[in-house]
Amino acid sequence: MYVTKVEKKLGIRASDTATIVFEDCRIPLDNILGSPEVPKTSEGFKGVMATFDATRPIVAASAIGVGRAALDFVRETLVQHGVPIRYGLPSHKLTALERDFMDMEAQLQAARLLTWRAAWMMDNGMRNNLEASMAKAKAGLVVTQVTQKAVEMLGPLGYSRQLLLEKWMRDAKINDIFEGTQQINQMIVARRILGYSSKELS
């Protein structure tokens, strides 16, 4: 067993991504998951997929944390210091930016409530496939929008690498990909709502 070269990524660089190669590696039958030839483990794949019901709320919570950090940073910069970056006025006095703050806060709160519900259902032994997928999809969308808007609100300073905003914006994108892409989570939710799934809505 060996690892190939570590990939250079857009974001989440503190976590390495690489391919693990199992060369001439024999796996004991008892360790095989999801093999259709082995009745004992034929449900293994479904079991692995079911873990997403637990991990998607965790990923959603992480995404919300990044979005919250970006919003708080911009608020502190503009409100406490009154940085004049657009139109010759302190940006916190501009109505357009007030609307931005309202929208960012509302979207983060909505994503957080979805995530709380998905986690609460998991903790109480309830099936949360629908809620976990909604929370993850919503949080991934929101963190991307919030971090991008945060960069815009600080103008050239926000785009510079001397602030953490550009890092948070890069880190945010992974939330559209891992633990199921946005399209996968949207498909899960849509099929449950439209009745394609054999399970009833929660």
Positions of predicted regions on the chain:
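FAD-binding core of flavoproteins
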Residues: 1-72, 184-186, 192-202
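A structural signal for short secondary-structure junctions
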Residues: 13-14, 144, 168-170
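A structural signal for short, well-ordered beta-strand segments
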Residues: 22, 118-119, 139
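Glycine-rich cofactor-pocket loops
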Residues: 33-34, 38-58, 71-106, 116-134, ...
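Alpha-helical transition-metal enzyme core signature, strongest for iron centers
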Residues: 64-71, 101-111, 115, 139-147
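A general lysine-centric signal
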Residues: 136-138, 173
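Short segments within alpha-helical structural elements
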Residues: 148-153
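Glycine-rich phosphate/cofactor-binding loops in nucleotide/flavin-utilizing enzymes
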Residues: 154-202
